[in-house]
């Protein structure tokens, strides 16, 4: 395994979606992540199975392994079941500093109102509520996300940039460079093909869930994207890949492979 200090001081976290088989077992996901050598982890909140016991188990694994929780996901605005309060409480209990939110609400104002409410719930825990834009949701691009965030009067609101969704939405790196960097408390990094298999919502979802590539293995200029952010900004490595799931059925081997290849990509870009 490559040494961390050879390549970058950036904190790297394994996104929970890289091992979707463990969505209902977040404590084991933390163990797998730490065992593979990651210094930080994502946490998936499953509404059906999460309990106070889950919070204790996840927190214990985080503390025992000396890793940090970069984020917890996901709050879906527009669904009839409101997971916001429960997820924020869980994030506070395990020490996650950011919460990922997506929206299917019909207007900027509706989304902003819900974000404002979530920010008020999360503020005491020093947690940032991060709106992610995706072409197949109501908030489709960085410009959409900026319009929403303008309507939120809260210091703990942010925007989550995922390189795949940046590319698919037509958002440019120049647009990112003109923004207040404080809007981006962490970033999701990966790579991808120059074009998705198609532009329908279902095809874009498949692109996001199954077809991602390791940074530097695709056509999305992952190195340039990485260079846009100071090294104190954590990167969540969001390589959701059906081929990797098939090649590495062992979870720790998969996590270790993604880490090694990501560190190699950072070494190339330095």
Regions found by a protein language model. Give the residues of each.
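Histidine-acidic metal/acid-base catalytic patches
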Residues: 1-18, 23-37, 63, 85, ...
């Amino acid at each position: 395994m490559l040494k961390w200090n050879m390549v970058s001081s950036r904190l790297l976290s394994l996104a929970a979606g890289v091992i979707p088989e463990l969505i209902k077992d977040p404590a084991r996901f933390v163990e797998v992540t730490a065992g593979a050598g990651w210094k930080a982890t994502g946490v998936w909140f499953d509404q059906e199975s999460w309990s106070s016991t889950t919070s204790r188990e996840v927190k214990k694994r985080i503390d025992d392994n000396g890793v940090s929780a970069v984020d917890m996901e996901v709050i879906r605005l527009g669904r009839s079941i409101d997971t916001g309060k429960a997820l924020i409480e869980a994030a506070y209990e395990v020490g996650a500093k950011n919460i990922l939110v997506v929206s299917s609400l019909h207007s900027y104002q509706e989304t902003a109102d819900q974000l404002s409410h979530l920010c008020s719930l999360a503020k005491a825990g020093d947690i940032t509520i991060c709106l992610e834009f995706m072409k197949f949701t109501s908030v489709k691009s960085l410009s959409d996300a900026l319009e929403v965030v303008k309507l939120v009067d809260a210091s703990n609101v942010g925007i989550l940039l995922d390189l795949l969704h940046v590319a698919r939405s037509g958002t440019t790196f120049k647009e990112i460079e003109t923004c207040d960097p404080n809007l981006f408390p962490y970033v999701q990094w990966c790579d991808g093909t120059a074009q998705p298999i198609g532009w329908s919502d279902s095809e874009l979802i498949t692109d996001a869930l199954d077809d991602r590539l390791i940074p530097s293995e695709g056509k999305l200029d992952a190195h340039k994207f990485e260079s846009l952010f100071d090294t104190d900004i954590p990167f969540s490595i969001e390589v959701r890949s059906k081929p990797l799931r098939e090649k590495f059925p062992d979870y720790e081997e998969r996590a270790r492979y993604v880490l090694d290849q990501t560190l190699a990509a950072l070494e190339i870009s330095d």
